[in-house]
């Protein structure tokens, strides 16, 4: 029978490290939080990598620094200057407080620390080399005030953890994301990120939140944002939110900090989304940058080792105030008339995937939808084949007789059955099958007359470098030319001459947001995004001929009854059901 035993210190430290240090970005996060807590105003993050992985992380700050005694203590588990006893946990004002970071990092890496206290009169600094949690070197060195910590050979003694790391670009994207979130929460600090000797990101100290946003995400986005403010006796809300026309396919760009701590909160993200009401479609999310100051007695940050999750007292009042503040900000800018749907010229009904698209002008409001991107002429022979090809999933023959709410096509079957066709879901199914077929044949790109240029934040550009082969499978041809700038030279033929970068940007964001998918799952997700983005939207008026051809195209698909997401494309009311509804016979 197995006996209970006390684990040795090395095993304990590695278990603790597994909770705190998941990947290189975890190291960056812990070191940056320590630097911010040390009252730094300038922080340099220097990352080195080879073609396969990140090899070294060095963080340099101009903070308070440490004495030789403090430097040694810093590597002891649960040694901290942030709190003294359990009472301090109820009002934590620093980013770190457990005293686990350096000990956890040193347990699974080789760490070199150089530090000199600020204003203490010390003529020399302290240098420590720690390997596997043990201090193997200690010496005096010349050093500026502040602290530099270099981390190398991460997970050298835990190969099982190392093999689960993602590609170099994916890990870099996570590093950039950590710096972005802390830079947004701490405008009083100047951050600079260098990768292999090249500057990748830089923010200015005390330049204001908008300047930080502009530096990280671009001036165009910063100029389009709407300021939001709100207040309760225990809560202050400040930040910026996007207009409804600037939305995303997932909530990953809702950035929230509470008392200077960047956090992830589904409840707060949902409150932000709630504030938009019907200004956004159900599957769209805003861009938001919120800074919340909450009474520390209402915030429990001692929930998870990474401190990204928190608990809030009076959560319902807080989320309600956030939703109200967002609603008020949008109302104050008269945005109710904005429509977040895609421009009409980006919507396509494809009849022949191989046909070269020709752009057409946007129609007048209320005019029938013009699908000039694709030819909509099918020969009589093609129409007859459409009506006869297929198996048991083939749609019954039906004739469109109109539209309801510019969203549903009303059609009648030969036996009097009434059909309602969701035009977006139907077209999404058509495009999905076309893109899948083109991908499988490895011949599905439509070259753009003018390449679409994408200027991305470092986080997204790193993700895109990894995603280029995956996007190529779908028909996107993407080249990198310059720092964080890419040219989209071709798109899936089913999309036609799309000139909006939103499809590529949303695909990248989705891939970055969910790395848990396997390669086939990620490829499937990309195909779904391409189909959804390219499909005609609800609210687009279709001519009778376009309605008919969309139904014909739907009938040719392998699974015409549902869209790729599983929603129905067609609902039917047969004659007996209609008679019953009107109590006939």
Swiss-Prot record:
This is DNA mismatch repair protein MutL. PANTHER family: DNA MISMATCH REPAIR PROTEIN MLH, PMS, MUTL, DNA MISMATCH REPAIR PROTEIN MLH1. GO terms for cellular component: mismatch repair complex. PROSITE patterns: DNA_MISMATCH_REPAIR_1. InterPro entries: DNA_mismatch_repair_CS, DNA_mismatch_repair_MutL, DNA_mismatch_S5_2-like, HATPase_C_sf, MutL/Mlh/PMS, MutL/Mlh/Pms-like, MutL_C, MutL_C_dimsub. CDD domains: HATPase_MutL-MLH-PMS-like, MutL_Trans. Pfam families: DNA_mis_repair, HATPase_c_3, MutL_C. It comes from the Archaea. GO terms for molecular function: ATP binding; ATP hydrolysis activity; ATP-dependent DNA damage sensor activity; mismatched DNA binding. This protein is involved in the repair of mismatches in DNA. It is required for dam-dependent methyl-directed DNA mismatch repair. May act as a 'molecular matchmaker', a protein that promotes the formation of a stable complex between two or more DNA-binding proteins in an ATP-dependent manner without itself being part of a final effector complex. Keywords: DNA damage, DNA repair. GO terms for biological process: mismatch repair. Belongs to the DNA mismatch repair MutL/HexB family.
């Amino acid at each position: 029978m197995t006996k209970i035993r006390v684990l040795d210190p090395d095993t304990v430290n590695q278990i603790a490290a597994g909770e705190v240090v998941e990947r290189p970005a975890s190291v960056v996060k812990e070191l940056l939080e320590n630097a911010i807590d040390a009252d730094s105003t300038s922080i340099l993050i220097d990352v080195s990598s080879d073609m396969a992985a990140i090899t070294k992380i060095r963080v340099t700050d101009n903070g308070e620094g440490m004495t030789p005694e403090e430097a040694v203590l810093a590597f002891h588990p649960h040694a901290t200057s942030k709190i003294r006893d359990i009472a301090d946990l109820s009002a934590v004002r620093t980013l770190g407080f457990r005293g686990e970071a350096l000990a956890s990092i040193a347990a699974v890496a080789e760490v070199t620390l150089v530090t000199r206290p600020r204003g203490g009169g010390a003529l020399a600094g302290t240098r420590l080399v720690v390997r596997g949690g043990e201090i193997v070197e200690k010496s005096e060195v010349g050093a500026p005030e502040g602290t530099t910590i270099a981390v190398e050979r991460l997970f050298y003694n835990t190969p099982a953890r190392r093999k689960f790391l993602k590609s170099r670009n994916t890990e870099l994207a996570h590093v950039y994301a950590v710096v972005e979130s802390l830079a947004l929460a701490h405008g009083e600090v100047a951050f600079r990120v260098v990768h292999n000797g090249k500057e990748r990101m830089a923010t200015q100290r005390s330049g204001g939140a908008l300047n930080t946003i502009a530096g990280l995400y671009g001036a165009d986005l910063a100029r389009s944002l709407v300021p939001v403010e709100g207040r309760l006796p225990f809560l202050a809300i400040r930040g910026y939110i996007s207009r409804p026309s600037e939305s995303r396919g997932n909530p990953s760009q809702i950035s929230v900090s509470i008392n200077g701590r960047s956090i992830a909160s589904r409840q707060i993200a949902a409150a932000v989304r709630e504030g938009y009401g019907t200004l956004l479609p159900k599957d769209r999310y805003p861009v938001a940058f919120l800074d919340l100051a909450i009474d520390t007695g209402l915030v429990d940050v001692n929930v998870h080792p990474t401190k990204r999750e928190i608990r809030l007292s009076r959560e319902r009042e807080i989320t309600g105030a956030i939703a109200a503040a967002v609603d008020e900000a949008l109302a104050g800018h008269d945005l109710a008339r904005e429509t977040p749907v895609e421009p009409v010229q980006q919507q396509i009904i494809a009849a022949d995937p191989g046909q070269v698209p020709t752009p057409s002008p946007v129609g007048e409001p209320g005019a029938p939808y013009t699908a000039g991107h694709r030819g909509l002429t099918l020969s009589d022979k093609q129409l007859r084949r459409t009506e006869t090809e297929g198996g048991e999933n083939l749609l019954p023959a039906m004739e469109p007789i109109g539209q309801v709410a510019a969203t549903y096509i009303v059609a009648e079957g030969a036996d009097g059955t009434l059909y309602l066709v969701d035009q977006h879901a139907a077209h999404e199914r058509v495009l999905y099958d076309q893109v899948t077929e083109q991908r499988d044949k490895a011949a599905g790109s439509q070259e753009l007359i003018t390449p679409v240029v994408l200027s991305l934040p470092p986080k997204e550009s790193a993700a895109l470098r990894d995603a280029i082969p995956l996007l190529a499978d779908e028909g996107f041809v993407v080249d990198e030319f310059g720092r964080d700038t890419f040219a989209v030279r071709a798109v899936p033929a089913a999309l036609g001459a799309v000139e909006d970068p939103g499809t590529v940007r949303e695909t990248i964001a989705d891939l970055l947001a969910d790395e848990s998918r396997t390669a086939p799952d990620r490829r499937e997700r990309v195909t779904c995004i391409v189909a959804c983005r390219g499909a005609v939207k609800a609210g687009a008026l279709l001519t009778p001929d376009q309605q008919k051809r969309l139904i014909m195209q739907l009938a040719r698909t392998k699974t015409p009854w549902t869209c790729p997401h599983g929603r129905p494309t067609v609902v039917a009311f047969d004659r007996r059901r209609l008679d019953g509804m009107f109590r006939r016979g």
